[in-house]
Amino acid sequence: MNDSEFHQLADTLMLKVEETLDQFDGDADIDYETNGGVMTLSFENGSKIVINRQEPMHQVWLATKGGGYHFDYQHGRWICDRSGSDFMALLAQACTEQSGEEIHFD
């Protein structure tokens, strides 16, 4: 994968996160801001989730209240380099824990 392909895939991932949050109709108030390739999700309880891209390694990183994760693009999905878990599944779990309301990223 070259840098251009990486950025296109990372942009697509972040757009999917934005679209899901924009369409979320639950009671939890989740705000997000994207600045310089870094997306920050802010929750009512003051906790945050940070998603950023690491261009030199062609990875997407996820920082949650529960820990940090690094994802590589494999077979059409972003996969955690330690656990093998899918990015969207880990993000949904973290958002659910930090917002107190079930959130799905399909």
UniProtKB/Swiss-Prot annotation:
Keywords in alphabetical order: Iron, Metal-binding
Alphabetical list of Pfam families matching this protein: Frataxin_Cyay
Keyword set includes Iron: yes
Gene3D superfamilies in UniProt: Frataxin/CyaY (3.30.920.10)
Gene Ontology molecular function: ferric iron binding; ferrous iron binding
One GO process term, biological-process aspect: iron-sulfur cluster assembly
Domain of life of the source: Bacteria
InterPro entries the UniProt entry points to: CyaY (IPR047584), Frataxin/CyaY (IPR002908), Frataxin/CyaY_sf (IPR036524), Frataxin_CS (IPR020895)
GO annotations of cellular component type: cytosol
Membrane-spanning parts: none
NCBIfam families from the UniProt entry: FeS_CyaY
Similarity section: Belongs to the frataxin family.
Biological role: Involved in iron-sulfur (Fe-S) cluster assembly. May act as a regulator of Fe-S biogenesis.
UniProt protein name: Iron-sulfur cluster assembly protein CyaY
The organism of origin for this protein: Dickeya chrysanthemi (Pectobacterium chrysanthemi)
Gene name as annotated: cyaY
